[in-house]
Regions:
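Terminal peptide-recognition signature
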Residues: 13, 69, 120
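Ligand-binding loop in jelly-roll beta-barrel domains
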Residues: 100-128
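"Short basic amphipathic alpha-helical interaction patches in structured regions
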Residues: 83-90, 109-111, 134-137
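Phosphate/pyrophosphate-binding betaalpha-module
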Residues: 121-134, 140-145
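Single conserved hydrophobic/aromatic residue that forms the stacking wall/gate
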Residues: 1-11
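A short beta-strand-loop-beta hairpin characteristic of the jelly-roll/cupin
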Residues: 55, 70-90, 100, 104
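A short glycine-rich, His/Asp/Glu-containing loop-to-beta-strand
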Residues: 18-73, 142-175
Length: 175
């Protein structure tokens, strides 16, 4: 279709980073390349086997005008926020947090043999930046799984081969 971009447009090199209260991670998007990936502002991946590198977590901090999507493959993370939500993200779970007009939250990993997952920051469109903040936990058992060859594909949002995701974004649609 007209306007469809095909092929590789940009290669982003990941960098090692430390965020929160000292959590070691790999930043795949969000260095100096934000304009090229909008509406995706940041994507961090974390894979740690030494609790000393992640247990200080991400203490109380604010967000505004974005959504964060955290997906956990291994481990557990405690979530709390200024809306009164308290939750534990477990293996295979996802959390979708809309900061909108503003939210304060924390994500504190629990000690485990391995903490593995990622977090994506999505820029809200200008007309939705001041929307009401909200928190949406997505339990792993509610995420559709498609098996292909040697892979299991978990469909968090959007649609893959006619299988709808566990949730649909209200502001930025998966294509």
């Amino acid at each position: 279709p007209d306007g469809l971009v095909t092929g590789v447009q940009t290669c982003a090199l990941p960098i090692s980073a430390i965020d929160g209260a000292g959590v070691q991670l790999v930043r795949l998007v969000g260095n100096n390349d934000v304009k090229e990936f909008d509406p995706f502002l940041l994507f961090d991946a974390f894979d740690a086997t030494d609790p000393a590198t992640y247990l200080k977590g991400f203490p109380w901090h604010p967000h505004r005008g974005i959504e964060t999507v955290t997906y956990l493959i291994k481990g557990e993370i405690e979530h709390g926020d200024s809306l009164g939500n308290v939750d534990v993200i477990e293996e295979g779970d996802c959390q979708w947090m809309t900061a909108g007009s503003g939210i304060i939250h924390q994500e504190m990993p629990r000690p485990t043999d391995r903490l593995l997952g990622g977090q994506l920051w999505i820029n809200l469109p200008a007309k939705h930046k001041m929307t009401e903040p909200r928190y949406k936990p997505i339990v792993g058992k509610d995420i559709p799984v498609i098996e292909e060859k040697n892979a299991k594909i978990r469909v968090l949002t959007g649609e893959y081969k006619s299988t709808p995701g566990a949730t649909q974004g209200d502001f930025v649609k998966a294509t």
